[in-house]
């Protein structure tokens, strides 16, 4: 059985694909780094869309802010091209936000790996104590 998706989810998914291609091809601003669009959340009335991005290779908050500033200033340009490619009657206003879930995931993975390594050390130390 096919999954049921709402119209806003389908539009958000299509916007994610289209925006990724538009940013790669059309945005020539040097402040925009290697941007990955992680999600697009479209409001129910299709008036606004939150576009969540990550910037690869740019871990400093200043570089991320510069990319966000450049993308938000190019939002009307991107919106115009989205309207042409998606053939929507009204294209949502675009609001770009940094997606911290990727960096949080990396941090949590590092914490888990460190905890596992410490458990192995304690386990090895306990086994060597019982052998003696």
Swiss-Prot record:
Q: Which organism is it from?
A: Pseudomonas putida (strain ATCC 47054 / DSM 6125 / CFBP 8728 / NCIMB 11950 / KT2440)
Q: Which gene encodes it?
A: rbfA
Name the Pfam families on file.
RBFA (PF02033)
What's its job?
One of several proteins that assist in the late maturation steps of the functional core of the 30S ribosomal subunit. Associates with free 30S ribosomal subunits (but not with 30S subunits that are part of 70S ribosomes or polysomes). Required for efficient processing of 16S rRNA. May interact with the 5'-terminal helix region of 16S rRNA.
Alphabetical keyword list:
Cytoplasm, Ribosome biogenesis
Coiled coil where?
none
An example Gene Ontology biological process = maturation of SSU-rRNA
* UniProt-annotated location(s): Cytoplasm
How does this polypeptide assemble, per the annotation? Monomer. Binds 30S ribosomal subunits, but not 50S ribosomal subunits or 70S ribosomes.
Q: Which SUPFAM superfamilies match?
A: Ribosome-binding factor A, RbfA
**HAMAP family, per this entry?**
RbfA
| Descriptive protein name | Ribosome-binding factor A
A GO CC annotation given for this chain: cytosol
């Amino acid at each position: 059985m096919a999954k049921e998706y709402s119209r806003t989810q389908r539009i958000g998914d299509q916007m994610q694909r289209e925006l990724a291609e538009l940013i790669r091809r059309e945005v020539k601003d040097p402040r925009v780094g290697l941007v990955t669009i992680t999600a697009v959340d479209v409001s129910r009335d299709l008036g606004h869309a939150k576009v969540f991005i990550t910037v690869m290779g740019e871990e400093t908050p200043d570089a991320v802010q510069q990319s966000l500033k450049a993308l938000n200033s190019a939002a009307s340009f991107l919106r115009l091209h989205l309207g042409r490619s998606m053939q929507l009657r009204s294209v949502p206003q675009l609001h770009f936000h940094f997606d911290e879930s990727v960096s949080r995931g990396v941090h949590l993975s590092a914490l888990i790996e460190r905890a596992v390594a410490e458990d192995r050390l304690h386990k090895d130390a306990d086994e060597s104590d019982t052998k003696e």
